[in-house]
């Protein structure tokens, strides 16, 4: 038929490929800055390249992905920021996502109360390296913190590090190929159980460092591998 040769064939869409908007990073940081207590920030499945560290300082926010192997925040080309994600807020939950290849610490939570870190993976994908960030999951000076079903791989210091905190549970988690798998430092009332800490220089460490804001006590460690 006349004119048929000029028509373009319909595009073939590969549904297995995630299409990520170019301005995702700007949108996500804006959501974090403008969040209100009670907000849930949902991040769909996909691998998202981020170039600057993220931060949250609003209480009562949940960040939720589609799964630790489905929603991936990749900081491989990070050019600014000391962490992948820095949180200085109370009543915070993060779950079902991964933070990869952060320039510094992957997930740092500082001076926060009532924190849940669940089904989060932190990883440096190039394998063990002294140039990797120091800490994977890093709550410091927190109170009432649950770390559950997380995975921490490849930190140049500790995969899961809890410092100067009170009332902490670390359970059902896996730490591999870090210098220290799980480290509890200067912390009161921590329970560490049902975890796997293998292929690290040290598996699970508990100690007090001098000249810090508090000395720790009453850490219980049981049923770990």
Walk through the language-model features, giving the residues of each:
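Extracellular beta-strand/beta-solenoid scaffold signature
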Residues: 28, 50-51, 77-85, 101-108, ...
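C-terminal motif of bacterial Sec signal peptides marking the signal peptidase cleavage site
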Residues: 2-3
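Solvent-exposed, polar/charged alpha-helical surfaces in well-ordered, non-transmembrane soluble domains
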Residues: 26-33, 118-119, 194
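Right-handed parallel beta-helix/beta-spiral solenoid domain characteristic of secreted/periplasmic
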Residues: 9-26, 60-103
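Phosphate/pyrophosphate-binding loops and the adjoining catalytic core of nucleotide-dependent enzymes
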Residues: 54
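Right-handed parallel beta-helix
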Residues: 38, 64-70, 91-101, 113-126, ...
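Short, conserved catalytic or interaction motifs in soluble domains
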Residues: 6
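Glycine-rich repeat segments that build the extracellular carbohydrate-interaction surface of secreted
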Residues: 19-23, 31-50, 62-66
């Amino acid at each position: 038929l006349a004119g048929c040769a000029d028509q373009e064939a319909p595009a073939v869409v590969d549904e297995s490929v995630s299409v990520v908007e170019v301005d995702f990073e700007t949108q996500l940081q804006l959501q974090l800055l403008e969040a209100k207590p009670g907000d849930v920030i949902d991040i769909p499945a996909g691998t998202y390249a981020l170039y600057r560290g993220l931060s949250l300082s609003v209480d009562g926010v949940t960040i939720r992905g589609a799964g630790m192997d489905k929603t991936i925040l990749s900081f491989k080309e990070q050019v600014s920021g000391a962490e992948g994600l820095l949180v200085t807020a109370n009543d915070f939950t993060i779950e079902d996502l991964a933070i990869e290849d952060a320039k510094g610490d992957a997930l740092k939570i500082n001076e926060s109360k009532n924190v849940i870190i669940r089904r989060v993976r932190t990883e440096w994908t190039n394998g063990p390296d002294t140039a990797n960030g120091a800490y994977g999951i890093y709550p410091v000076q927190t109170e009432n913190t649950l770390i559950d079903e997380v995975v921490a791989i490849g930190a140049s210091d500790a995969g899961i590090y809890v410092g100067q905190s009170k009332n902490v549970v670390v359970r059902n988690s896996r730490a591999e190929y870090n210098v220290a798998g799980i480290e509890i430092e200067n912390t009161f009332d921590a329970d560490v159980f049902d975890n796997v800490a293998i292929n690290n220089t040290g598996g699970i460490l508990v100690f007090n460092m001098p000249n810090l804001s508090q000395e720790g006590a009453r850490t219980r460690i049981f049923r770990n591998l």
